[in-house]
Regions:
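Active-site neighborhoods and metal-handling regions in enzymes and metal-associated proteins
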Residues: 1-207
């Protein structure tokens, strides 16, 4: 919990900085990544980023697990969204947090899909369920608001994660179909940590 609180402070400062400076100075995917790492490092007990930060702007955000390079790096501008899939490693624990930051005014279509993804995340995170449930039996709670729009995303909704170790850690996760090669189908036990990361990805446009 302390790690999540510290990471939330860093992330809130980052979003505030982003929204107040994207139209005043040149900010790119890579420089945004450096800024968030700097803000995390200012938190007591920070050790390192949990994994390579993934900041994807505009059409890049529709490419699952896109990671910016000096060759692909683009400047952030208004009228689009920045997808940030990042995490921090602290002495108290690790985080894996995905956030979408709106810059300026966006289209009605973007608003509709952004809202659907928000509903999806909330449906799953607020769910009450009985002992003995698995991720594959609960995944539909996240997907339903997205399925209602005849959309889907081609990955699991969430995965287990460890403490200053592998950020993708078995034995559980959220996926409505079973992938035999993935050890993610164990029933939930008290104390397990699992991410909640639904999404909509419109190729060539946004995500």
């Amino acid at each position: 919990r302390n790690a999540e609180l510290k990471d939330s402070v860093a992330l809130t400062k980052f979003i505030y900085w982003l929204k107040n400076n994207y139209d005043k100075m040149k900010i790119t995917e890579l420089s945004a990544s450096e800024k968030l790492t700097q803000l995390r490092s200012e938190q007591e007990g920070y050790v390192r980023d949990s994994f390579e930060p993934l900041h994807a702007f505009g059409a890049h955000a529709a490419m699952m697990h896109y990671s910016p390079t000096p060759e692909s790096d683009v400047e952030l501008k208004g009228g689009q969204m920045l997808l940030s899939d990042t995490g921090g490693g602290y002495l108290e624990g690790s985080t894996d947090i995905t956030r979408t930051t709106i810059l300026g005014s966006i289209s009605d279509e973007m608003k509709k899909y952004y809202t659907a993804v928000y509903k999806s995340m909330q449906h799953l995170s607020a769910a009450n369920f009985l002992y003995g449930n698995h991720g594959w039996s609960l995944d539909v709670l996240a997907r339903q608001p997205i399925w209602d729009l005849n959309k889907d995303f081609q990955c699991g909704t969430g995965h287990g994660f460890g403490y200053l170790g592998s950020i993708h850690e078995p034995p559980t996760g959220f996926r409505w179909y079973i992938v035999p090669s993935k050890n993610e189908h164990h029933q939930f036990e008290e104390g397990m940590m699992v991410t909640d990361e639904p999404g909509i990805y419109e190729e060539g446009e946004f995500g």
